[in-house]
A protein has these predicted regions:
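Terminal edge beta-strands and adjacent linker/stalk segments
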Residues: 130, 465-471
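Bacterial Sec-dependent N-terminal signal peptides
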Residues: 1-9, 475
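Conserved beta-strand/short-helix segments
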Residues: 6-401
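Extracellular and select intracellular beta-sandwich modules with Ser/Thr-enriched
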Residues: 232, 292, 348, 462-467, ...
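Non-cytosolic beta-sheet module surface loops
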Residues: 107, 160, 211, 418, ...
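C-terminal outer-membrane/trafficking sorting elements
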Residues: 423-432, 440, 444-451, 455-462, ...
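A short beta-strand segment in extracellular, disulfide-stabilized domains
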Residues: 411-420, 493-497
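Surface-exposed coil/turn segments at beta-strand junctions on protein surfaces, enriched
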Residues: 20, 85, 138, 240, ...
Length: 553
């Protein structure tokens, strides 16, 4: 495999501020998948209730072109959405769908998650007048402590950590069936639902239970099979007491990569208050969750590495909040960006520091799907001129270079496979990177010795892989097309029908990870592979190779 991962500076784009003292603006933040819209929670805002704090509200901003100044800026979109009661901490967590036209707001003081859609007047209209709540027969669960919404805005999850539950709803307008599976998802552990995140389809969810086992913490992943939520793989656990593994979690779009923040981690298990922190990434290999690379650890006491985490859509870029870091100045906090280069997590650029003492930058972080837009919440930050007695909170937005999955180009003889769900153009490196005519498929079979690369376009971003040298001693590795794979889509077994003998079949996920190898057989059992898109490579006995995309349902 090879990769492209440049050191990118994230440039400060704009600063958004809370409207009043002690708003705690930036307590929560989320970016739309396209990176054009941002939602911010401010749990300290009084929301119109006189002399009462911690009511909370949420604001939404959209990146808008101003013709008068010939520039782009983040502009308030629609009305601010206030709490409907006092002391309910509305905005404790927030979520937004891919195009930024549907939002969810957690209100744990009411055990409620409210859903809004952007209407034709550019205001926010409630999708359900009462929001989505726990059953009236159940005691308070702090539901809404964590929330998430899927890419098209039709599935939403609400963590209820005092009940160790996650309430997951089908909220599709006019046809949504309400609570999926008919019951909330009951998750083992203590404070389960303290953190949640959905995949893009809304069929997978990662759940943190960070107070489990003397606050070692644990994380579980579930898939929806059409009727029930079923645990996928093993329970992931922290190492030491008070690690708080699962304090925050993030899931890639395909649901096969998760990032887990452990804000309380310390290499010395006897230290219960140092909170250096650690963040770990796991990939699904078809049967288990396997750690990807080394864990990323804080450096100093009170760093709280992993207080907040966010993955790009493809899971190859990660933003980590170090909320308590004293590196710049006391409790300024910081955020670091890491890119996966194919073998390790590499820090991208310099840390982004909070701009003053005790602003707690990194309390919340969010990345767009392509990893180019970054939002950072600092709950006690201020603007250039502090017009308030106390800090109102801030969110700073940054823009950098997008990230493309060029880390998964696989070479097999004279066959190159770009394993990414994207568009392709193969290039001739020995001819000034000139495009090869009609070479726009995922697989390229070189007919001549030389050096070749691929230009991949994904989520509006384009990058080029490194060059691969091809030495051809024969042309036996030709691309084979005369075979049939069925059924496709499949829920279980696939069969390859060909006149040629099959030596080996390999199944890879969209990130290029090998999921399954089958030798000397024309069938493959996918029963233990989670739903999604995969790539099947077939090695025939004549040296030929076949490739096909398969969909596991």
């Amino acid at each position: 495999m090879n990769s492209v991962s440049a050191q990118v500076t994230f440039n400060h784009d704009q600063e958004l501020l809370g409207e009043a003292s002690d708003d705690l603006f930036g307590w929560s933040v989320d970016l739309s998948g396209d990176g054009n819209t941002i939602i911010v929670g401010a749990i300290g805002n009084n929301a119109g209730f006189a002399n009462v704090s911690n009511n909370g509200h949420a604001r939404v901003y959209r990146n808008t072109f101003n013709a008068s100044f010939n520039s782009w800026s983040w502009v308030l979109l629609g009305q601010e959405i206030n709490a409907t009661a006092s002391s309910v901490e509305s905005g404790y967590d927030v979520g937004i769908n891919y195009d930024g036209n549907a939002i969810v707001i957690g209100t744990p003081g009411q055990d409620r998650m409210r859903v809004y859609d952007l209407n034709v007047s550019d205001n926010w209209s409630p999708r359900n007048s009462n929001g989505y709540t726990i059953s009236s027969s159940q005691s308070a669960q702090r539901a809404g402590h964590s929330v998430s919404i899927n890419g098209n805005g039709n599935v939403a999850a609400m963590g209820a950590p005092l009940g160790n539950k996650v309430w997951i709803f089908d909220i599709e307008p006019n046809v949504g069936t309400g609570l999926m599976s008919g019951n909330p998802l009951v998750v083992p552990g203590t404070y389960a639902g303290g953190s949640v995140d959905l995949d893009d389809e809304g069929n997978s969810v990662v759940v943190g239970a960070y107070k489990s086992n003397s606050e070692r913490g644990q994380v579980l992943v579930y898939d929806f099979n059409g009727a029930n939520w079923v645990q996928r793989g093993q329970i992931l656990s922290g190492v030491n007491n008070y690690d708080q593994f699962g304090f925050d979690v993030s899931m890639s779009n395909d649901g096969n990569t998760i990032a887990v923040g452990s804000k309380g981690w310390d290499s010395n298990p006897n230290n219960t208050t140092y909170e250096i922190g650690e963040t770990t990434v796991y990939d699904w290999n078809g049967s288990n969750w396997v750690q990807r690379g080394s864990s990323i650890q804080g450096i100093n006491i009170f760093d709280q590495c992993g207080f907040s985490v966010s993955l790009s859509g493809n899971g190859n870029r990660m933003a980590i909040g170090y909320k308590g870091s004293n590196e710049a100045t006391t409790a300024a906090g910081l955020v670091r960006i890491f890119d996966w280069n194919g073998t390790a997590w590499v820090q991208n650029g310099d840390p982004i520091y909070g701009d003053g003492a005790s602003v707690y930058s990194g309390h919340s972080v969010a990345l767009s799907d392509n990893g180019s837009i970054l939002a950072i919440g600092a709950i006690q930050g201020t603007g250039p001129i502090n017009e308030f007695t106390n800090q109102q909170g801030q969110v700073r937005v940054y823009e950098g270079e997008c990230l493309v999955s060029t880390s998964a180009v696989i070479q097999n003889g004279n066959t190159l496979t770009a394993v990414a769900n994207a568009s392709y153009q193969w290039l001739d490196c020995n001819n000034g990177n000139q495009p090869i005519p009609n070479a726009i498929e995922q697989v390229y079979v070189a007919q001549n010795p030389g050096s070749y690369s691929v230009q991949i376009t994904e989520n509006g971003c384009t990058q080029t892989s490194a060059c691969f040298d091809i030495t051809i001693t024969s042309l036996k590795n030709e691309k084979i097309d005369n075979f049939l794979v069925f059924p496709n889509p499949t829920s279980n077994i696939i069969t390859v029908n060909s006149d040629l003998f099959i030596q080996e079949m390999q199944i890879l996920d969209v990130a290029g990870k090998l999921i399954l190898t089958i030798s000397n057989s024309n069938t493959a059992d996918l029963i233990n592979i989670s739903p999604g898109i995969y790539f099947l490579t077939i090695q025939f006995n004549n040296g030929g190779i076949g490739h096909v995309k398969i969909l596991k349902q």
